[in-house]
Amino acid sequence: MNGNDANDEKEPMRRLRLGQPRTGKSFALGALGIGVFCLAMAAPVASGDWPQFRGPNSDGAILPSEISASSSGGNRRAAVTALDGPTTFDRGLTIGWKVDLPGRGPSSPIVVGGKVIVTASSGVRQDLLHVLAFDAADGHLLWQRQFWATGRTITHPQTANAAPTPTTDGNKIFAFFSSNDLVALDLDGSLLWYRGLAQDFPHLGNDVGMSSSPLVVGDTVVVQSESQGESFVAGIDTVDGTTRWQLERERAATWTSPALLPNGKEMAVLVESAKTISAIDPATGIVLWTHQQDCETISSACASGGLVFVPGKGMTALRVGAGSAEPVPAWTNNQLQCGAASPTVLGNRLYAINRGGVLMTADPASGKILSRTRLDGNFWSSPVAAKNRLFAVNFEGVGQLVEISRDGSSGKVVDKIPFGETMQASPAVAGGAVFVRGDGHLWKLVAGTEK
Amino acid sequence: MTSKIFTVVMLAVLVGASGLSAATNETELSAVLASIKQVGTKGAGHRAAQAAWQKLADADAAQLPAILVALDDASPLAANWLRGATEAIVARRLADGGSLPTAALEEFLADRRHAPRSRRLAYEWLVRVDQTTADRLLPGMLDDPSLELRRDAVAQLIVQASAKGKQDPDAAKAILQTALQSARDLDQINDAIRKLGDLGVKIDLTSQLGFVTHWKVVGPFDNAGGRGFAVAYPPEKSVDLAATYPGKSGEVHWVEAEASDEMGHVDLNRALGTHKGAAAYAFAEFDSDAARPVELRLGSANASKIWLNGKPLEEAEVYHAFTTMDQYIGRGECKRGKNRILVKLCQNEQTEDWAAEWKFQLRVCDPTGGALEQQEKNP
């Protein structure tokens, strides 16, 4: 045995399925006619920012940098203005830069104000937490802040303390960690406040590792932390870090992340546990509705077009109304399964990657599977989609660009990009570039030349 | 106005009254540091700390040693506020081409009365401005209270041993044995043992880590619905190795159980049979030549409780959420002579294959994680 104490490494990860090319190499992703899509802007982030896990809508849909999101009431949800148009990806992608990271982390990069924000954890006990800001233009390190974890730092070796993706309201950054440390910084790295939520909840923690990524809506950071010891969802004041509201939750582990749900002119937040999905008013913590529903505890729900897509024994779509009206099931398809990757929805296409690495393209209105495309490897990273193309990065660190036919009836991998290291983070897309993060590096992909 | 509120307000007034230049007086700095150090849980004190933090972050680098001193007794939350400010100070100073107060930082680092985290921070700053720091200072840090400093010192020795290699195996052995004696992290311990093995020196990993390998165990007791975790079955009241108890499905009595691998794992399924919704107890004794702080370090995927000499040290009602060495640490005091360890291990009723595990490992350590010199007793 030789002292290897990674006990039962495979077993917990069966339950927790998370989510070197060099500069100048063109990957020539081919023509990517990115359409203009219905996109939500939950916070006053600038057009072209990628403010949180799975992007502006928390649904994996790419906000084309060419398109300015138009305000639509309080939720700033942009309107669909076109279905075809030029995009920054039309000429393929080339490595813009690649930089070293000081630690590991499945957390995804976010982009705000021309800065790429990344979290990492390091040290043999994973107790050193890093928040880094890189210049999106040239990749140079703008600032780095380090903190000592105040909660449990044990995780399965596959994941790391820096698993949750940070979030931003456009002015402030909120970085969350498996150890339940929540740090607020301004865009220059100045500390605004620091919360150690495990100091408030001593039994909080999961030694598999926690991964729920927070969201900002208005002046509230919504944090979901659910474990066998203690569980809660809380709204934290973005200004001073105090708790605005707090909801006790079932004491059971979940790794899903809150997602945005348009609610009239406001924005609600979806939170899941194994048997329920709820919509919460982020300003008050009032539960708008709770629906009994089998939910996966790793892949997260997302919302689009009045439907909420919930991974759980396949996929279920819930039709939501305004306010606190409980949603009504629209369809269930037990073949439309998600593995660790969360579903992506874009216009009239719904994508799910199952545990076998098969990408399923479905009609979000009916749940009908239109095509199945086998990808290489397994996926912990959630894909991003633009028009009829989808970009997914497998665990081994191979990016795969998939083109789906217009009618959705077929798909094919049109390019592969080997990054050469393990990848669990989801891509971020902003300012006409794609940012991907692996166990040791951060890459920027920029427009290149077409093959 | 309560005195606490008054204090915070006065601190805020002082903080807002002046900057923190190199010539800042001690009172001003103390006020700033106090404003930050009063942060509490649930966001308490953040407003006052925010104003103070900006002042502190703007301070001159000459103030760094004083801030490190403040870190010594700061709460874990306040420590991060202070650390954030020091990083802003250091980054600005170095970006401006300035220097750090190296003599004062080195003096601070040398004083082991300061908190390990503060000293580690001083060391990292010194490394950034003086490339000789590691070679000069690490050799004296093999027994450092800071596990990070100790780790770097051990790593330096392992590199030295590798350089000696087969050219001078006796020197390499000596260096590796010193490294092994100081190492506290499993990867370094394994590395040193493997390299010593290559040189013909066999080290027993189990003893090196301090695992208890001989146990008496009893069970199953009822834990249906997880309710047995809170039930104090007879062994929690007193351990009588000759006793029999009413168990989950009949009378139970203490039986022998041995660790089945070099990492000290004791398999309760093997010792007691496979059960679901069950609780068991494991008992062992060890001798200590003196009363001293001790840590009972448990690894188990089952819900657990730990007692030392009848005193509860630690509990975790968590099932099958990964396990690793030193997962739960019970801190206490052992006494001179015989000490009694009792562990409760609860199995739940999950039916998945991976939830069949009902086992544990436990080692007896000093507060650095080194194996306590002990004579394990067969109870």
What are these regions (language model features)?
Chain A
Residues 42-451:
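Noncatalytic, solvent-exposed loop/strand surfaces
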Residues 5-8, 21, 38, 51-54, ...:
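Compositionally biased, intrinsically disordered low-complexity regions enriched in proline and serine
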Residues 1-27:
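N-terminal secretory signal peptides that target proteins for export/translocation
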Residues 30-42:
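Bacterial N-terminal signal peptides
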Residues 25-28, 32-33, 393:
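Compositionally biased, low-hydrophobicity segments enriched in charged and small polar residues
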Residues 23-24, 34, 69, 84:
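Intrinsic disorder/low-complexity segments
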